[in-house]
Amino acid sequence: MTSMKPIFSPTRLLVFAFTWMLAAPFAQAQLDRVYDLQGDNVSGAVVERSKDGVKLEKAGAIKDFKAGEISKIMFEGDPASLTKARGFALDGQYDQALTELKKVKLNTIKRDVIKEEVAFYYAMCEAELALSGQGKIDDAARRLIEFAGANRDSWHFYEAGKLLGDLALASNNSEQALKYYKSLENAPAEATKIEARYLQGLVQLKLKQGPAAVADFDKILGLKSQTTQIVRLQTLSKAGKAVALAIQGNGEQANALTDTLIAELNPEDVEIAARIYNARGASCEALDDIEGAIMAYLHTHLMFSVQPDAHAEALKRLVELWPRVGKPERAAQARQELQSRYPGF
């Protein structure tokens, strides 16, 4: 895999951080539609936007929408291909989204905010594809940094920061991943701030720092807020804590935690399911239950492979574990898939 150093160097990071801080409001008046995370929408004119969100004017009243609490904005004048691309991207169909984005003729677009949307979804889709092994991480990171530099007033600002952290972590650049994830603590939405802590916990897991990871996850588990977003982050944090406990050799405690998680598992939430079964695999390994660990990682591999980082981790563990039960040929198969889908993992 291409080295991340040219993209995630200290100099580039400082430039990017400076861009982060300089994001400023921008005013326009058009008929637009802002959708929240529940799918409800309000129509009006986006009269101001910044990295922290947008202000929508309707019948003389101004309503604030925070970045992190917006699912999408449909702008007056959106090309049909952008509308389709946005829908595909938010549904995880990144190839189809890029196909539609390539049909957009930028020279026919009058509003800068719409050009900004095109640029963001290009960068987002390329990043997500790179994370799934279908593109170069270095190129995807470069496009995201270019997006942030050219669109300092975008409500997608923190989304871009999270993706940059994901790309850095996928490249084993944990230090830069921590910096990007920590920057999300400056976001206006409570859930984004909490997600920042969860993501930092994932980095600690990558570094095999069990106590530090437990500390991050426990901060989330101790929260009283019960919004849908935060409850979901608490479930993810339980799975992360189970892995951290396993790293510390507390297999029984980790196993008990994953028992509860599996009993309450919703298989439609692929990310949660994949992380729970990987946590189960880690807890079984800590108990020297190799067959149990293999079964858990196979759940992720066979049922939840669309979650790329969890799938890659499951394959990596299967490469190590299959020979221990006398099946080196299965290890070779897992290694081949790991190298072809996630080169450099």
Predicted regions and their residues:
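Bacterial N-terminal signal peptides that target proteins for export
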Residues: 2-15
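Bacterial N-terminal signal peptides
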Residues: 14-24
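Compositionally biased alpha-helical segments
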Residues: 28-171, 175, 179, 186, ...
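Register position in tetratricopeptide repeats
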Residues: 90, 128, 170, 206, ...
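Conserved positions within tetratricopeptide repeat
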Residues: 98, 134, 138-141, 158, ...
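Alpha-helical scaffold segments of alpha-solenoid architecture
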Residues: 232-250, 256, 283
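TPR/TPR-like (Sel1-like) alpha-helical repeat modules
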Residues: 294-302, 315-345
